Amino acid sequence: MLSFFTKNTLTKRKLIMLALAIVFTFFAFGLYFIPHDEISVFDFKLPALQYETTVTSLDNFLIGGSTTLYTATVNHEDLNEPKSHEIVMLLASDGNVGSFESNLLDDCFKNRIEYAKLQNYNFEFVNVSSLVVPPVWGKMPAILQTMRKYPSAKWIWWLDQDALIMNKNLSLQELFLSPAMLQKSLLREQPIINSFGEDNFRITPAAYSKEMIEQIQFLISQDHNGLNAGSFLVRNSRSIALLMDLLTDPSLADAGVVRHEQDLIGYFIQKHSQVASMVGILPQRFINAFHEGPPTMQWQEGDLALHFAGCWVENKCAELWTKYKDKII
């Protein structure tokens, strides 16, 4: 079961420490889950106590340059749940855009700012060029940094730079993020696709109670290859802070057994029931539609966001960006 981590760079002692850290957090913060691993159905107990959600300071080598590109107006009369000003949109980059031309990055900023203004969301950019982790692994420390900067925020939405928000009039709460909509939206009795080539192990619950919805901490979608971290949301909670901190561990990236951060997230979900119990799987087109694929995957007019995943492979980012930019509503 732990053969994934038995590389020279990871000792048995580290494995034990890692497991203890995960278990400690969920028990220490009152999140108790009784997993039935055969079908991944979880019985939930509500926390006995409320805990401080403030994230502790990061190590200096994990702190990038943070810039607020839009600040939401605090509106306590907002009837949405969560309130709009309690949501932070997040983008991070090391400045190396590759085939994703610099003018497209400017377009990306403009697109996100327009949406943030219309929906009254915060929008944060983190420059991760100084971080001592590969750029693709910079998402986790950027999230941690943003969690600390916005202690009153409830949710953080990560969206890759090669994505356009196509429907600016559609709010996250209206689409899926309110508790009532989330209860309706999460995929049920669906296998979580395993990118490691093993048999699918986790299956999403057959139903979600209100208590289960309250415990969901991580929202993501999957394509035909598995989880896709081009677009996902996390709660601003200590549980997520610890998970992000562990995923940032250089040993996990240096081991070379996964190519991307999303593969490691998938591994934690597959192998750790406590992590799995925090995760909700959304239909892909809700937050991460592609420009091509089957109907459940391919963007359709009215969908929120369009992710040009892999556009850099054939140097088509600019072509696709221009094609779909005129279809924004």
Curated annotation (Swiss-Prot):
<keyword id="KW-0472">Membrane</keyword>
<keyword id="KW-1133">Transmembrane helix</keyword>
<dbReference type="InterPro" id="IPR008630">
    <property type="entry name" value="Glyco_trans_34"/>
</dbReference>
<feature type="transmembrane region" description="Helical; Signal-anchor for type II membrane protein">
    <location>
        <begin position="15"/>
        <end position="35"/>
    </location>
</feature>
<feature type="topological domain" description="Cytoplasmic">
    <location>
        <begin position="1"/>
        <end position="14"/>
    </location>
</feature>
<keyword id="KW-0328">Glycosyltransferase</keyword>
<keyword id="KW-0808">Transferase</keyword>
<dbReference type="InterPro" id="IPR029044">
    <property type="entry name" value="Nucleotide-diphossugar_trans"/>
</dbReference>
<dbReference type="GO" id="GO:0005794">
    <property type="term" value="C:Golgi apparatus"/>
</dbReference>
<feature type="topological domain" description="Lumenal">
    <location>
        <begin position="36"/>
        <end position="329"/>
    </location>
</feature>
<dbReference type="GO" id="GO:0000139">
    <property type="term" value="C:Golgi membrane"/>
</dbReference>
<feature type="glycosylation site" description="N-linked (GlcNAc...) asparagine">
    <location>
        <position position="169"/>
    </location>
</feature>
<dbReference type="GO" id="GO:0005783">
    <property type="term" value="C:endoplasmic reticulum"/>
</dbReference>
<keyword id="KW-0735">Signal-anchor</keyword>
<keyword id="KW-0812">Transmembrane</keyword>
<keyword id="KW-0325">Glycoprotein</keyword>
<dbReference type="Pfam" id="PF05637">
    <property type="entry name" value="Glyco_transf_34"/>
</dbReference>
<protein>
    <recommendedName>
        <fullName>Probable alpha-1,2-galactosyltransferase gmh1</fullName>
        <ecNumber>2.4.1.-</ecNumber>
    </recommendedName>
</protein>
<dbReference type="GO" id="GO:0006487">
    <property type="term" value="P:protein N-linked glycosylation"/>
</dbReference>
<dbReference type="GO" id="GO:0018279">
    <property type="term" value="P:protein N-linked glycosylation via asparagine"/>
</dbReference>
<comment type="similarity">
    <text>Belongs to the glycosyltransferase 34 family.</text>
</comment>
<feature type="glycosylation site" description="N-linked (GlcNAc...) asparagine">
    <location>
        <position position="127"/>
    </location>
</feature>
<dbReference type="GO" id="GO:0031278">
    <property type="term" value="F:alpha-1,2-galactosyltransferase activity"/>
</dbReference>
<keyword id="KW-0333">Golgi apparatus</keyword>
